[in-house]
Amino acid sequence: MDPYKHRPSSGSNSTFWTTNSGAPVWNNNSALTVGERGPILLEDYHLIEKLAQFDRERIPERVVHARGASAKGFFEVTHDISHLTCADFLRAPGVQTPVIVRFSTVVHERGSPETLRDPRGFAVKFYTREGNFDLVGNNMPVFFIRDGMKFPDMVHAFKPSPKTNMQENWRIVDFFSHHPESLHMFSFLFDDVGIPLNYRHMEGFGVNTYTLINKDGKPHLVKFHWKPTCGVKCLLDDEAVTVGGTCHSHATKDLTDSIAAGNYPEWKLYIQTIDPDHEDRFDFDPLDVTKTWPEDIIPLQPVGRMVLNKNIDNFFAENEQLAFCPAIIVPGIHYSDDKLLQTRIFSYADTQRHRLGPNYLMLPVNAPKCAYHNNHHDGSMNFMHRDEEVNYFPSRFDAARHAEKVPIPPRVLTGCREKCVIDKENNFKQAGERYRSFDPARQDRFLQRWVDALSDPRITHELRGIWISYWSQCDASLGQKLASRLNLKPNM
């Protein structure tokens, strides 16, 4: 074996203790001192190495989605959609692709309870024959904002106050009072689904609009949906308090224990598609991430199933170092002009480079399983063995060539450079429809959560009035009930 091409792993552990460089360690219990009670000597390299390594064990926490759990498995195509996409891993029923999935909470820190009211991340990395595909979504089909320009401000509002280091309702209510497009997302977050029972019993959504392209270059806008075969289950507020007080890692434990017991979680993948030529036929913009596509007019189409049948081997290597980015796509799947997706394309890779370093895609959990070739050389923590003489392109001494051209959306865009909001905002209709779909008891729980949120003493009379106005525009009875419980008059 060529030692220069050997990747270190626990599989090559020696039977005795060593330093990182392989030197034998005959005493891992005591520091080197002058005599039995004398001072420690600086020449105790093993002690210095051990402490220095310990001091650097932690890496920067994810700015969002810090708390998470991962598992591995496979995705299998069950229905032919080759007329919609030329993606190789979707080429025919029966095709299987290895995957790794990370579930997470969003706002709270790495050690926070998994029972807090918060969206849940649902990110899937497909290791395909044409490179990796990252489908990075949530357990709710919409989002709070439609323009990524507001993403840092939104996260700041949700995160703890810079003064008190506590999450405070008045900051959230204040920020989103300027963003009525958030009402639809809040109709999910303040609903029962705001606290999933665990990761196995929650849905997943790609959230953003993507584009499928077939072999003829025909594009279709697409939304991705994951449906758990064991059904959707949630925790009510009092149940969440009990569960969280018993085990703050209950969802991680449930996922790990279920897989270990052979009770493998499974999700069915569905898509919705819209012909770009028909995108103006709706009362919403299909690129607006705050909207769902009504399933009665844009039905779900089955694609495949995902089974998680293996727990990760190491939390740090396969969860903390696991990195997703919506920019990582494969031929046959492309981006759309969704404003939030466009900003995520940059931001996700940028934060991974900050967290893990410029060569984070070389880490085993992030590297593609297919062959790959480029001149992205060197940089911090580059551990790939390379012996090429040519590190430029093109060259007559290197046979590497361009890949075959793949179809991309043929759309021609024209327009003025401008910063503006979309024409079809329609901020209240879908939120109202969702509220009216609840049974009376569920409506009352939703209402009470908003009463509690707006009862924060820092929230002004003006802010309460704005939110009552917003919810009144979603549903008049909801606004009236909210005003009544807050002892205010609804002001449309």
UniProtKB/Swiss-Prot annotation:
Active site, renumbered: 65, 138
Major localization class: other
Catalysed conversion reaction: 2 H2O2 = O2 + 2 H2O
Gene3D superfamilies hit by this protein: Catalase core domain
Annotated EC: 1.11.1.6
Places the protein is found: Peroxisome; Glyoxysome
Enzyme class: oxidoreductase
InterPro entries: Catalase (IPR018028), Catalase_AS (IPR024708), Catalase_clade1/3 (IPR024711), Catalase_core (IPR011614), Catalase_haem_BS (IPR002226), Catalase_immune_responsive (IPR010582), Catalase_sf (IPR020835)
GO cellular component: glyoxysome; plasma membrane
Gene Ontology molecular functions: catalase activity; heme binding; metal ion binding
Binding sites annotated in the UniProt record for heme: 348
SUPFAM superfamilies, sorted: Heme-dependent catalase-like (SSF56634)
Subunit structure: Homotetramer.
Function: Occurs in almost all aerobically respiring organisms and serves to protect cells from the toxic effects of hydrogen peroxide.
The protein's name in its UniProt record: Catalase isozyme B
Source organism: Oryza sativa subsp. indica
Chain's gene name: CATB
